[in-house]
A protein has these predicted regions:
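Internal alpha-helical scaffold/solenoid segments in large eukaryotic proteins
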Residues: 84-85
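Nucleic-acid endonuclease domains
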Residues: 1-77, 81, 91-98, 104-239
């Protein structure tokens, strides 16, 4: 088996353990908020960026252990806008690297078979020029594979969350979590890419948003292969 196949299989096995790490028995996120020295608990916002960052912090000890158990070093992105979030570098052969990006999104409450979607990194300089070091930890072409570690969840009903209220730590169990019903997945990013750009004005690759297709890796390029994904996005809106 190739290094990429071995890494992918181990990462897939690891991801199956993460739901229990972040969830209570009823599916609620075990993170309830943040605490001050007076033991007051403040509810966190349901803003996706905040939830995503706290989930990363929550999962990081597990990520580190996974890397150590499998002979990899973890290199974090040096800057906030760098790709990827985590580079796994093989300790015995540092030329073997895998890019892993955290992707967090929530289910559509009206159409729960859909999620809000997410971006899959830039199709700009470092994607077009695979030797470039602009906004990327290592050159894109030096990675043996590019993976998404994805998290899909339900947002709590806004009526049950009061961000203006603080709680005593004794009330911890009664605080409604801002997220619940987590679903974790891992896939190579090209397998869940769409043919449309991500949100905003940045040059980002957009994902598909059907949850079943995301979990099965059935994106726009899944039958064509990674080469066609690369060709399409390297030439996006240029032809």
């Amino acid at each position: 088996m190739s290094e990429k196949t071995i890494f992918a299989e181990k990462l897939e096995g690891f991801v199956k353990s993460l739901k229990d790490h972040v969830s209570s028995s009823d599916g609620q996120w075990t993170v309830k908020g943040f605490i001050d020295i007076f033991k007051n608990v403040y509810t966190i916002s349901s803003d996706t960026k905040i939830v995503s960052k706290i989930l990363e912090i929550h999962l990081f000890p597990k990520i580190l252990k996974f890397a150590q158990d499998n002979g990899y070093k973890v290199v974090l992105a040096e800057h906030q806008n760098y790709y990827p979030d985590i580079s796994f570098v093989k300790a015995a052969d540092e030329s073997v690297r895998f890019a892993v990006d955290f992707k967090t999104t929530y289910r559509n409450p009206i159409k729960p078979y859909l999620c809000n979607g997410f971006t899959l990194g830039s199709h700009g300089e470092y994607f077009e020029n695979r030797a470039s070091t602009k906004n990327i930890q290592f050159p894109y072409g030096s990675y043996s594979g590019h993976f998404c570690l994805g998290i899909i969840y339900d947002r709590a009903d806004g009526a049950t969350i009061d961000e203006t209220k603080s709680h005593n730590i004794a009330e911890l169990q009664a605080i409604t979590s801002v997220a619940k019903n987590f679903q974790f997945f891992v896939t190579e990013k090209w397998k869940i890419a769409s043919d449309k750009g991500g949100s905003g004005n940045t040059a980002n690759i957009g994902s598909i948003n059907n949850i079943a297709d995301i979990l099965a890796g059935r994106g726009m390029f899944s039958k064509l292969g990674e080469h066609w994904f690369d060709e399409y996005w390297m030439n996006y809106k240029k032809i």
